Amino acid sequence: MRALLIAVVALALLAGSAGAGSGGDSTVARLRLDGVAVRPELALTSERRARGLMNRRKVPADGMLFVFRQSTSGGFWMKNTLVPLTIVFFDASGKRVRRMSMVPCREDPCAIYDPGRRYRFALELRAGDRRPARKLGPLPALRHLIRQAE
């Protein structure tokens, strides 16, 4: 029984870190998108948010979630991003602000994808992801992520 408990704890710890072959060095979060469990990679620091999914050939299955300590404005660009993406912006309560399609930037100047409203989270997904992405949650988990953001 004790060996089983140790194995379960070890698996839980491993599940919280990004996969070695994914190109990511961030952790993942256990959240819900429209009530369905998702585990996006996290971009909690300014450095990680600036790097995002640049130079990666594969997008994580549940995307990458950019978390901001304060509501912010402004947009994202696709410089050095190799694959097209869908981006969904959410407010602090997890309600969708805007959804946009983004294409890789081949030369300067690169387009800026700006939702036109303030947001607290941005979720980058594979281009064409068909999930409605209307609500991100649960709220206590989102608040915890906001406290972790730098």
Which residue ranges define each predicted feature?
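Positively charged n-region of N-terminal signal peptides that target proteins for export
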Residues: M1-L4
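Bacterial N-terminal signal peptides
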Residues: I6-A15
